[in-house]
Structure formats: C-alpha cells, structure tokens
Amino acid sequence: MDVTPEPVLLPEPKRLGALARLAPEPMKVVLNWGRRYSLWVFNFGLACCAIEFIAASMARHDFIRLGVIPFAPGPRQADLMVVSGTVTDKMAPAVKRLYEQMPEPKYVISFGACSNCGGPYWDSYSVTKGVDQIIPVDVYVPGCPPRPEALLQGILKLQEKIARESLSERYGSPRPSAAALQSDLVRPPAAGTGAGTAEGGAR
C-alpha cells in the first residue's frame, strides 16, 4: 500500500494578492508612492527613438532624478517598458512575450510616432499600426523622434497616473489573451503542409 501523501495544491495566487486588494486607503497611497518613484525601465529599442531614450538617461536630462532606474537586467526585473521605434508584424510576438514576462503591476510607454501608429511606415504591409494593437499602453509620447524632454514629460504623466491608481480599477477588467493578439503572418504552418508530404517526400 502506497503511503506517500498527496501533494497539497495551493490556490492559484491572484495577480496582486488579497492583502494588497484589502489594504486601507492610506496604505494604497504609500504603495502607489513606492511604485511611482522606483520604476525599473526596460527599453525595447527598435529605431532612432531608442537613441533619444539613451540621451534622456544620460547626465544632461538624467531621468534617474525622477525615480526611473534605466536598463533593468531583463523584463522579469522591470516595472516599465518603453517601446521606441517601428514595430513590425514579425517583431510583434517578441514584444508581447517580453511584456508578459514582466511582473505586475507593469506599465508601458509608447515612445515616438512609429510605436504610436506606425509613423512614416504606417502603410507598409509589414508594420504594426501601433504597439497598442499588441499590448496595453499607459502613456503615448508623440514625435519623430521625440526629444528627451518629451520622454521626461511622458514619465511625469505616468507617475501622475500611478499616484491616483486604484488596484481594483486597474485589474478589474481582464487583459486580452495572447491568442487574440496573434498576427496571421506569424502563425506556424498547419501540420502536413511542410517538406516530407506526399508531393515532396519519398513515395
């Protein structure tokens, strides 16, 4: 007779946990204040806007003074994702995957015209018409490319949004599923359509 105890399955944790949801209003203010001034940023740099992002992080503009810590080791350590540059349909699944690897609560700044709506390449067959077709965006920074001061203004707008954020409002609505956001251009081929079928393989 097997006497091995059955493993106890813990309930699936909610995104923020019951304690964070039940926190009194003053505690929520403290939580929002902490998130607001300790944003580890992950830059998904795709084009010339990424150069302006780097300029904003250097000594002249220095967005560290706003509480934004640049160059997180990876998406799993990041709170803020800045998408800067042209997002192509082939790159879209990678953007979505990196976004999903970020822990909650997470924020996205769309930096530049290409990231906002496709920019000068909007009519190309291979360009995604805005990163908000793939992931939710919190702040849009217009420009082609935007100046570093524009990114600083976008960061301040995001911090204002975080300061008045309610956890129930942010996480009350379900996020779109990954399947709903996949492009037909990047779907794997159906089974039996590749090499080795009856037409191309040995008979």
Curated annotation (Swiss-Prot):
InterPro entries hit by this protein: NADH_UbQ_OxRdtase-like_20kDa, NADH_UQ_OxRdtase_20Kd_su
Membrane topology term: Peripheral membrane protein
One Pfam family named in its UniProt record: Oxidored_q6
GO biological process assignments: aerobic respiration; electron transport coupled proton transport
Disulphide connectivity of cysteines: none
Cofactor comment: Binds 1 [4Fe-4S] cluster.
Cofactors, names only: [4Fe-4S] cluster
Gene3D superfamilies: 3.40.50.12280
Signal peptide (residue range): none
Gene Ontology molecular functions: 4 iron, 4 sulfur cluster binding; iron ion binding; NADH dehydrogenase (ubiquinone) activity; NADH:ubiquinone reductase (non-electrogenic) activity; quinone binding
Assembly and binders: NDH-1 is composed of 14 different subunits. Subunits NuoB, C, D, E, F, and G constitute the peripheral sector of the complex.
Protein family (similarity comment): Belongs to the complex I 20 kDa subunit family.
Descriptive protein name: NADH-quinone oxidoreductase subunit B 2
Provenance organism: Streptomyces avermitilis (strain ATCC 31267 / DSM 46492 / JCM 5070 / NBRC 14893 / NCIMB 12804 / NRRL 8165 / MA-4680)
Taxonomic lineage: Bacteria, Bacillati, Actinomycetota, Actinomycetes, Kitasatosporales
